């Protein structure tokens, strides 16, 4: 048996062991979140409702929400959710299943790229880093497509890395790159093409290898890309031409939702943007706790011009490619409007950088002593953060007060609606009284950080980096479990499922459901009841543009129209925030239900 054959036979069982460990980790962290909490108002339930209406209308081209055209998003996420609904029925868990499987697919893609670039241990540590990072978990609690963009970018870079290893790039590698870019376009729009194209071009430019582009089967790859990406765009344009006050699909989707959004000129202006410094800082927070190892990981990537002038080995090529990948995303959004989660597609690249470094640190290479010194320093910094987190959480526990008997969490929050355009805006609502609801979760986070980072530092001091990494991974399992528990307690604030269930119990055909505010503020009513709702608000947000088409249902109510409806013979269920109870007509209002600081009022007792 040759040494190569022996290495392959040894690697295969190790690879299976790594993959089994990763799948088990995914099951423990991500599967419980399929079933709880309930879907949230805004993007979570709006996107689930758009998928439900695909099946309701048998229309896989034009998305709808509340019966109105919903043209601002690319369709792939909605297609996967609709397919899940068709197979498993319309359920919370079936709505979340595609995104959870997307996490697993991204973990496996990261493993494959890391293994190809730096060996199986690097692939394993990279996928471990991704699976246990804070940002990936938080932003897959909501049905948004950014994680899937990270998946397609990982596959794009995997195929491009194969291209770099081939003197004459194969059809499979070139077409795989084109297909991944096309799927990314169908997931998030034009950035699905801009990101991989920029990464490939900048890499070849820096390494003075632009001639490789001519060998990348550009014509056939473009055909593959267009075959996948173009049909939906063409059909959407044909099915949604300019009509009435609406300027059609192409203007809204490409001009308004891509170019004007990037330039902060999009209409309507119903969004906020994260400050630039916070945006970059949050990219590190989302990689926590593994961001502590990012500085030495980045230091190993080629970063001087003279480095690019020489032939790079496999790990150097990977380091440069991954650094460019992360930089393209962070720099791109530095010049546009941005949300906290726009950095998510960069996290696989950062996880791969960290995973490759962790693998080298744990191996007995000549560089290991220097790497382990850097690892001990990073672990010490992390332990310092762990102490700070522990002290802060213990301080919050001391400040927190046990909630009064019978009190709701909503009663103890301080509302900050000006922050709600940000995805994590409700965090600013917490008060010392409200923190009393989260004493257990705070204890888990504080003790978890202290014990986990302390063990990580202690074991690295004893030259046991593998044990140290395991301690950090287990720490994150506990912390993410605490996040899941906290979200279940916060769910009545973030969603309106209990109110939808209360309506369903007494609903009769002909009754009318009205949301006092924007559609997104109570969109779970639409999803959980399966009944179109009306909106006591001017045209705005997700339904703004679609409402201008002549065939759009008249769902927007005015004060005058709601007064007539309220005083008529029709039974009306009015969703309203406790802060904004409207002045209704002559008939009295009766409370049907309340939850999370929101009420369902009705004009009839029966």
What are these regions (language model features)?
Residues 2-370, 396-400:
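Membrane-integral, polyisoprenol-dependent glycosyltransferases
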